Amino acid sequence: MQGGDHGGMEMGVGSFTGGGGGGECSSSSATAAAAAAAAAAAAAAEAEERQLLKGEIAVHPLCEQLVAAHVGCLRVATPIDHLPLIDAQLAQSSGLLHSYAAHHRPFLSPHDKQELDSFLAQYMMLLCSFREQLQQHVRVHAVEAVMACREIEQSLQDLTGATLEEGTGATMSEDEDETAPMLEGPMDMGSDGHDLMGFGPLMPTDSERSLMERVRQELKIELKQGFKSRIEDVREEILRKRRAGKLPGDTTTILKQWWQQHSKWPYPTEDDKAKLVEETGLQLKQINNWFINQRKRNWHNNSQTSTLKSKRKR
């Protein structure tokens, strides 16, 4: 009996202990499941909020300018032959923005909208400033790289007599062909276009040439824009002087009539000039200038006529 009672007690304790462990396991599983569900709900809410915020940005008035500012930064140091890739991505982004805008649902408070406006405006200013810094960086360092490349080419030519030409590699004169084997050893080029001494390609690659051409075009545009206002001012000044120096047709008719009447001695006296001032309404300086120019024109025509007459006599 005692053995049976002892065995039964052990079984009872075992049963009590086992029952308690099952309750703890189910409680832990429920807590973990609740935490996972809460995390999933929070992630879903955050994802939905991000989608709604993307829709707010897509319909914002500054959205197109922001995209243009981003693309402007990308275009600064992108080789010309790679620019179509940016255009293709830009076309895709346009469709994406339209999809965001199609699912737009206002959810921001007036205060949040003001904060979004301020953030986007500051972000666009940052991108514009960054683009200017990139342009300055590319211009300065591209010019330095080109100058350094020219110095290396000149040093190589001074040392070896080799002249680097685009597309043909190093060329030598016929007298130096015999020394070519000595140069092939240390100056041999690898299959990837880099020399084995570790100096890299001596001639600029297509991307480098494209970048150099881009920098040259940007500098040209910048110079034209810098001097544009000055050129327009000079042009306007020239046109103004031309308009100011051109006399009305009726006044020149009166002056020409006087000229034809006094063609033998086309030098008006002060009284003649005063009368012409009264008849034409011009200033004395304008009349003096017209007679000076008219005498020059007439002298030029007379000289041509006399030259033709002398040739005919011969």
From Swiss-Prot:
Q: Which ranges of the sequence are annotated as binding DNA? A: 239-302
- Signal sequence span is none
Q: Which gene encodes it?
A: HOS66
Keyword list (alphabetical) reads:
DNA-binding, Homeobox, Nucleus
The record's section on PROSITE patterns has: ELK, HOMEOBOX_1, HOMEOBOX_2
Which GO CC terms are listed, alphabetically? Answer: nucleus
> What organism is this sequence from?
Oryza sativa subsp. japonica
What InterPro entries does the database record attribute to this sequence? ELK_dom, HD, Homeodomain-like_sf, KN_HD, KNOX1, KNOX2, TALE_homeobox
Please indicate if the UniProt record lists DNA-binding as a keyword. yes
Q: What is this protein called?
A: Homeobox protein knotted-1-like 3
Question: Which PANTHER family does its entry note?
Answer: HOMEOBOX PROTEIN TRANSCRIPTION FACTORS
Subcellular location as annotated: Nucleus
Swiss-Prot/TrEMBL GO biological process terms: mucilage biosynthetic process; mucilage extrusion from seed coat; negative regulation of DNA-templated transcription; regulation of secondary cell wall biogenesis; seed coat development; seed growth; xylem development
Gene Ontology molecular function terms on file: transcription cis-regulatory region binding
Classification via Gene3D superfamilies = Homeodomain-like
What protein family is recorded?
Belongs to the TALE/KNOX homeobox family.
